[in-house]
Amino acid sequence: MARGPLTYRRLRAILKTFGVYEEPGRGKGSERMFVGIVDGKIIRLPTKCHNEGDEKPVPVIQAIRRHFKLTKKDGVSDQEFYNRA
């Protein structure tokens, strides 16, 4: 799959394969909390999700990847990222 928008459900499944999980009961209202360990530290990132089928635009996906060090610079190519799950 080429680099492009993803549904929230698919994004969550891809992140799970990299050890980043959605923390249940966290976040306020339409926000959901992603949690992962980066360089030995627990990292949290809130993201908007009104429903599971919402598409996340490329800039949001890029920000999430940077936050959890899942970029090409960190050794994870676009192809490897998008072909997970």
Q: Where are each of the predicted segments found?
A:
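Basic nucleic-acid-binding interfaces
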Residues: 1-28, 33-85
